């Protein structure tokens, strides 16, 4: 049977459900597919397969659906630890999120934690679904819960006053009853998501960046750098910079090859070889990046949000303390760095997610939101994301 062709006639947005355990994330996901996609039953979504991202095993369910304006890929995770790991590793990129809050409970510890994580890992916006409203008889109580959610969002620098909060019942929508809080609430929610979560800039429209994977010298032609273009476009004749590890160098791309064919350009997603003018083979190494001049700077100090693997996940068996010195694997290479723990944090246990500062021994081309693995002698012991660059 021929595979269904992916129609790219609508903008594509990646989204996910977040929120406290048992507040109805998976039921809501199922309800959205009932009205906007190929219906997926609750247990189909909940029995999510495991996948590996940056050496970490995560269970995530992926569903897709579309509104009149957009195509959505939606991720839902069965357990809280899976959410933390997913958000930190960026295994399933989220351009926006639907925060699910049970109206009877109001915001709970994981509600807060997911909002904070969203802020740290750079989820730009959220829309709120206030679920299980049929379990609350008092209209004033609903208003209080809504206020509480808005204040919580504002306290983490989200626009709490402007974020749409949609009351409803995912279960009513699933069971096809009480349309006002069922089907209509789901439709209102998706209208809010359509309107409030911005369409992300496509990778190809962003400034050019390619991590260096390998470097060759071709006699009579010069130095060729290979890698996969992460974003943007490179044209023959473009000026580019080589950033990271050593001092930044400027050069011109004099040729682009793909599968040994000469091209006039390479774009996001392509595996290419770029021929660089006047650059010695020794001057470029794996771990640097080629990029549009001035678009990315090298840094050594940053703050990070990280998840530390448990022993069962193949991680450390013991906690680590201040001045822990693992390797930080950025894009294509390991760089040693020293960890500075926050005041009041004595140690970090396997299974924790934690914020800390890092100082690398060599500069790396980095931006806020860049993901990395934490490794010890080639073994992954954690994953993290740059939440703030300090130097």
From Swiss-Prot:
GO cellular component, one term: cytoplasm
EC top class, as a word: hydrolase
Keyword Cytoplasm: yes
The EC number(s) this enzyme carries: 3.6.5.3
Region (G4): 131-134
Record region (G3): 76-79
Residues at which Mg(2+) binds: 26
InterPro entries: EF-Tu_GTP-bd, EF-Tu_GTPase, EFTu-like_2, EFTU_2, G_TR_CS, P-loop_NTPase, Small_GTP-bd, T_Tr_GTP-bd_dom
Family that this chain belongs to: Belongs to the TRAFAC class translation factor GTPase superfamily. Classic translation factor GTPase family. EF-Tu/EF-1A subfamily.
Biological role: GTP hydrolase that promotes the GTP-dependent binding of aminoacyl-tRNA to the A-site of ribosomes during protein biosynthesis.
The protein's name in its UniProt record: Elongation factor Tu
Organism of this sequence: Roseobacter denitrificans (strain ATCC 33942 / OCh 114) (Erythrobacter sp. (strain OCh 114))
